[in-house]
């Protein structure tokens, strides 16, 4: 949408450079809302840090054509090394979403922590609000040329009616648990929701599995077009 700069906005920015050390600061004030950003980088050591604080900022004043309103959040990051695939790089991230009003949705109590060490990224995400109560843990190895990671998602409450997916309120909120893993020669997934259970396991990596699945679909669609199913060919 169109970005508008409100007349009531006040912006102050500061940049300081001393040899390999770079520092920057920014403060934005608009009505009752404010945003503060501070960042520092040493290009010699590749050590960096940054923090962001947004309090009750009315985003609709900047994006009047979009249905996005109040935002409050805080974030902090620090680390060393600009090559995320290097085993010598490390980083930490903490993000907390205190309030986000988008359309009819009100999100709050959303927290994300992330770490990078030895090319391994780990993340922990929690959500505790009326729309979604959830915990997610994930990890992914950036150094490998093939997908290599795992994720677990535990949803204890998901309101599909409030999200506009279900026309009527549900008697009980949706809950489910998902655990998935991808390695060089293994892909597995386990899904449980109420009485429904689904398990997937393949003795191949993600890329070979995608190629095999694509080939299977191509052969199947060809047989459907020719109106002649060949089960032996499909099993190859």
Q: Residue spans of the language-model regions?
A:
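Interface amphipathic segments
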Residues: 1-236
């Amino acid at each position: 949408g169109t970005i508008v700069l409100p007349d009531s906005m006040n912006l102050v920015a500061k940049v300081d450079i001393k040899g390999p050390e770079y520092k920057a600061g920014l403060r934005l004030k608009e009505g009752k809302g404010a945003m503060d950003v501070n960042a520092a980088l040493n290009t010699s050591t590749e050590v960096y840090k940054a923090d962001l604080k947004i309090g009750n900022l009315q985003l609709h004043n900047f994006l009047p054509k979009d249905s996005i309103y109040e935002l409050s959040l805080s974030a902090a990051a620090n680390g060393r090394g600009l090559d995320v695939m290097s085993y010598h790089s490390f980083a930490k991230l903490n993000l907390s979403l205190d309030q986000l009003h988008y359309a009819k949705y009100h999100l709050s109590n959303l927290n994300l922590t992330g770490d990078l060490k030895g090319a391994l990224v780990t993340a922990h995400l929690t959500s505790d609000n009326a729309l979604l109560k959830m915990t997610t843990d994930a990890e992914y190895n950036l150094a490998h040329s093939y997908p290599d990671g795992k994720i677990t998602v535990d949803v204890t409450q998901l309101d599909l009616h409030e999200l506009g997916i279900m026309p009527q309120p549900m008697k009980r909120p949706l809950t489910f648990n998902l655990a998935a893993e991808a390695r060089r020669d293994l892909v597995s997934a386990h899904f449980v929701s109420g009485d429904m259970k689904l398990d997937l396991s393949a003795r191949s990596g993600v890329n070979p599995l995608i190629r095999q699945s694509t080939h299977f679909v191509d052969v199947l669609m060809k047989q459907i077009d020719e109106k002649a199913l060949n089960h032996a060919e499909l099993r190859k």
